[in-house]
Amino acid sequence: MHLLPHSLRSLAASSAALLAAAFFLPACSSKTTGSSSSEDLLSFVDPFIGTGEHGHTFPGATRPNAMVQFSPDTHLIGWDASSGYHESDSVIYAFSLTHLSGTGIGDLGDVAILPYSGADTLRPIAQFDKTEEAASPGCYSVRLKNFGIQTELTSTDRVGLLRATYADSTDRKLLLDLGHILQPNWGHKVVGNDFRLVNDSTIVGTYYTKGWAEHHQMSYILRLSTPADSIALYRDGERQRLSAGFAVERDTADLKLHLYLPKGSAPYLVKVGLSAVSPEGAERNMQAELPDWDFEAVRTESRRIWADLLGKIRIETSDTAVLKNFYTALYHSHIAPFNYQDVDGSFRGMDKAIHKNPRPEEGHYTVFSIWDTYRALHPLLTIIDPDQALRYGKSLVSDYDEGTILPRWPLASNYTGCMPAYHSVSILADLVAKGLATSEDLRHWTEAAQRSSIYRADLAEKFAGTRELDLITRHPYYKER
């Protein structure tokens, strides 16, 4: 599940994706200028590296440690669907707002939308060619060839922005698939939906799923750049036309909303704000980060942010393959953990309650593959970004404060119980050894380490009845003292 090696391991397997990079479309291109600026380092990042074989990365738009990872879902079934995308695919089921990168298990895929045209079908599926697909840090684009739609994605930390350019003569439609899930054959499923049609350009809701994260929910607000002409809901395949004010609560049916958009030649934009707290939180996040519709401004700012981060390390070599491997790996290593907190400091804790960070500028993070990253990523950050290294450590301790133990693999306010050992303590000990912790931190963290050494079977639901749980509960070291 380690993020860095996949960029090396999957290079040969991703040759088709690398070939596609030569056909980058202008909005998502990343060309070398010949200068030594930080901006120029972006040309060495290839988001398609790792999307083949079992690298389990995705090519979509994101910012460092952002809540949003806006990316196409081309694969839904099995291990190849861990990130939602696989290099071997030629269809797109939807563009969803959250993804895991480089992990051995999949989840998320929250809030799935798809521009389409032509005949109505319950679940339209887009087709694409690799030569018409492009990605660079902060931007992804693809032509949906069976619909004749050029689709581009970019994002802020908590808001995804889609720009769709439909053919002049085509009907303009948009699917919001509230039944979308990755790896349903692994038992992952949508367990409920709240949503409300505020008006003909705004939908708010909360999406509840059961997957690797046993109890996951993501709230959202979806806004259209121009009001829809009409909106229809398919509930378990039965169609009904909606009007403003329509709402459902914890609906367990398969829900798909089809939005029929006005014709026109200008690009159509859709933005989706996220919050793990509430739809109101999603709206606040959108208002704070993307109150307007300036796609190019968002993309440009994303590139600047990534360029600044990549510029923290410079290597000297004439071998462009080494540069591409290195800077793509550095890019991948800053996708997760991601900030699970709203702009006002609110976040959903491991106890599922809502908490408020007294220092919202620091963030609260989730998606820690700790058994991989404790020995490389976290020590690296103490050198190139010690403030961020400390924020990660404090997030792990916050998980302890809310959930009573330090996590092994925290995922969206869930203890997954994944992977053995005790690596949160290694991360905290490294912060102490490098002088990044206060004396109060040391006292608090020592308490967390001691109390977390006692195995909590009730916080690892998926391991009930397994050999691992049986062994641990019989071992005298883990028994309550």
Descriptions of predicted regions:
Residues H2-A16:
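Bacterial N-terminal signal peptides that target proteins for export
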